[in-house]
Regions:
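Structured, contiguous alpha/beta core segments that scaffold functional sites
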Residues: 2-266, 270-272, 276, 348-364
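Short Asp/Glu-rich motifs
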Residues: 115, 296-297
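Short acidic alpha-helical/loop segments enriched in Asp/Glu that coordinate divalent cations
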Residues: 245-247, 285-296, 325-329
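Short proline/glycine- and acidic-rich turn/helix-capping motifs at secondary-structure junctions
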Residues: 250-255, 295, 340-345
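Internal mixed-charge
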Residues: 264, 273-282, 316-319
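Long, compositionally biased
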Residues: 304-340
Length: 364
């Protein structure tokens, strides 16, 4: 670029005319984009790990993840046919069949859903771009590793412009942000999850406790010492093991304990809390093997439809709609899950293996 007269006399060039300086990362730097793909730095949040330890929550998550992970993605345009907008399916971009070069779509989409389900948001980092500037490959960023400085949550109002990964700032233009229409379950009902965890802990303690089947009570005579009572109980147990009939004198009475296994394991409380967790996870309770009283006939196809409509669809639409945004695909190009194959029954592994009666059923 030709210098002006002032620049020639001063012997220097104005900074505005100089190309921007690109600062190289210091040797051994870490965090931010430098940590993407370094899986030894990845982790899941403790609140998520606590919630997944609840059996109903785990079952709900696995049911929905199995649907999200096993459905194919397809790409289409829309065209006006004179009456309505018609979908015209097109050849997909290469990344649609393998979103991340390092893992399968089944794995990545299932764990992308996992972040949406538990936290209400999920992230993919753009690791390469095609010649037209659009993303060509991605890598998942675990939600627990990402910090949103401008929107700490738990409710997110839009994409964040201040994302930090492993302590360093990320260029938000290289991050695809999935925002769930449903708040993450670890934020929705913390007390319900805490109650379920305490209930499981109580059941575990009771399962480890030895409660006698009965009590020998002295009703008369000279009071017996602790040693004598222990010897009498041991002799009584030995006699019961070797004889069908036990004998007691008029000064000793045998009284059965009223504690039963269902009371010890808090079965009624467990059933109620399982129902609460099914409500929290937004799936019909019968899909998690929970008894719901009166029933009407439910076929396997109707069960798949219930799982899709009440549980999976909101998350599937969130993922597909985010992939259809203009920072991922050109305007007018869209992505959707092939839900028809699932609803028509070509994907039946998960539902056919469910442990439920043949006349299983939804609440009437």
């Amino acid at each position: 670029m030709a210098k002006t007269l002032i620049e020639f006399i001063a012997g220097k060039t104005f900074k505005a005319d100089l190309p921007p300086v690109t600062k190289a990362a210091a040797a051994g730097s870490y965090g931010g984009a430098n940590s993407v793909g370094k899986y030894y730095q990845y982790f899941e949040g403790q609140s998520r790990n606590n919630a997944i330890s609840v059996p109903t929550c785990s079952r709900s998550r696995d049911l929905m993840a199995s649907v999200i992970g096993c459905m194919q993605l397809r790409m289409y345009n829309e065209m006006w046919n004179g009456n309505e907008m018609e979908k015209v399916y097109i050849a997909p971009r290469s990344w649609l069949r393998r979103i991340s070069p390092s893992v399968t779509n089944n794995f990545l989409l299932s764990w992308l859903f996992d972040d949406l389900f538990f936290y209400g948001a999920a992230y993919l980092y753009v690791t390469s771009r095609s010649s037209d500037g659009y993303p060509a490959s991605f890598d998942r960023l675990p939600f627990a590793n990402v910090t949103r400085q401008d929107q700490p949550g738990p409710v997110f109002f839009g994409p964040s412009n201040q994302l930090y990964f492993a302590g360093e700032k990320l260029d938000s233009a290289n991050v695809v942000q999935f925002l769930s229409p449903i708040q993450g379950i670890v934020y929705q009902s913390t007390q319900a999850i805490a109650t379920a965890l305490k209930l499981e802990a109580a059941r575990y303690r009771n399962a480890s406790s030895s409660i006698p089947a009965g009590i020998l009570r002295q009703t008369g005579g000279e009071p017996m010492s602790a040693q004598e009572l222990g010897d009498m109980a041991a002799a009584f147990n030995t006699a019961r093991e070797t004889n069908q009939t036990a004998a007691l004198n008029e000064f000793v009475m045998y009284q059965e304990t009223l504690m039963s296994p269902d009371k010890m394991l808090l079965v009624a409380s467990s059933e109620y809390q399982a129902m609460e967790m099914a409500r929290l996870c937004n799936i019909p309770p019968y899909l998690a093997g929970i008894s719901v009283g009166s029933y009407s006939y439910q076929s396997s196809s109707e069960a798949r439809a219930d799982l899709w409509n009440f549980g999976v669809r909101a998350y599937a639409d969130c993922i597909a709609s985010t992939f259809s945004m203009n920072n991922v695909l050109p305007n007018g190009t869209y992505v959707e899950f092939d839900s028809d194959a699932y609803l028509e029954g070509s994907y039946t592994e998960e539902m056919s293996d469910m442990a439920m009666p043949t006349d299983v059923v939804s609440q009437s």
